[in-house]
């Protein structure tokens, strides 16, 4: 079995990695060591894991990605984005109206004359607006915080968030990552810096079938749960009044 084949498999299955060789490339050596290392907190009860505060990772750890969530954007916005991607006809009218307006209030202008020689300026202005929009989008991506659900080869599940810009939006489910020594682990969550994680790639094709629809259903269920929690809290407050 090759190292590349490990990237496409479920690491919780019984996998026999190829024998170590000094001729392996640096990337393959990292995969080998991370797979052979003892899984993080294997067999530790979940309540004890949550008690672990600011623990420093002391070895290379291999994980597979079960879920990627952009926690910078609201669930409702992400649901709308996915539904629009799946079926552009379902894009909400208010988003179409406000798309070019940015965050400011909608403004109207009364046109009293048309300068036919001003087409060049209009084109330049439109180009400038598009560039500004692209720059704003790029800046937003750099500021995005992602929550990753990770699984070790022992089957234990952990979470991770990035503390420096790391773009996980295109990460496929089943992708493999190696978390490096020096990473901080706090109450069940790895705090990732771009210099402390290696993205290996890979994909689990079964997990990614109808991925967008599955993720949309997942977000909708979480949104519904949040609403129930809010409504439940409101009812309790009314009962106590």
Curated annotation (Swiss-Prot):
Gene Ontology MF term list: enzyme activator activity; four-way junction DNA binding; single-stranded DNA binding
UniProt-annotated location(s): Cytoplasm; Nucleus
Taxonomic lineage is: Eukaryota, Fungi, Dikarya, Ascomycota, Saccharomycotina
Record's miscellaneous remark: Present with 1500 molecules/cell in log phase SD medium.
Q: Which organism is it from?
A: Saccharomyces cerevisiae (strain ATCC 204508 / S288c)
* Name of the molecule in the record: RecQ-mediated genome instability protein 1
One GO CC term, this protein: nucleus
Kindly state which keywords UniProt assigns to this record, in alphabetical order.
Answer: Cell cycle, Cell division, Cytoplasm, DNA damage, DNA-binding, Meiosis, Nucleus
Subunit (UniProt): Forms a complex with SGS1 and TOP3.
**What is the residue range of the signal peptide feature?**
none
